[in-house]
Amino acid sequence: MSQPSRPSLAEISSALEQLADRINRTEDDSLEPFVSHSMRAVVNALEYHIPGLEAAPDLEAARGLLRGAERALERGQEREALSRALRGLAFAPHDPSLWYMAGSACFELGQVEDALRLLCHTLWIHPGHRAARADLEALSAFFEGDEGERAA
């Protein structure tokens, strides 16, 4: 029985770039279900590739896009921040700072489930990422407190 084929890093990078383009083309207040599903599929596919084993296609471009995503988020342009973070990830698919930025943008867009998934992926890549850990703990505490209030 043959192994199912897994996407290559080049194919994953292409998918991230296409997601960034799709986010730029729409102006809804929330993300399309297709985008959320595709981000989940990309995260799952990336977990079959060991971070650092393959060189990032263009780390300098990724860093520039990270700076652009940070500025967009500071200006309240969450969709732009997410698009830039995903485009940056096309150049550096295992960059924890870009995954963290994508998660932060998702949270600001109200996509809490996506934000949690991306924060967890950030920590999968870099378990010592302090900001991702702090945000994940804060969100977890919030939801645990919310469940406790519902049970009472």
Question: What is the predicted function of each stretch?
Answer:
Residues 112-117, 141-152:
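Alpha-helical linker/edge segments of TPR/alpha-solenoid repeat scaffolds
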Residues 46, 71, 105, 139-146:
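TPR/TPR-like alpha-solenoid repeats
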Residues 1-58, 152:
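Long, contiguous interaction/recruitment modules in multidomain scaffold/adaptor proteins
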Residues 54-108, 121:
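Alpha-helical adaptor scaffolds
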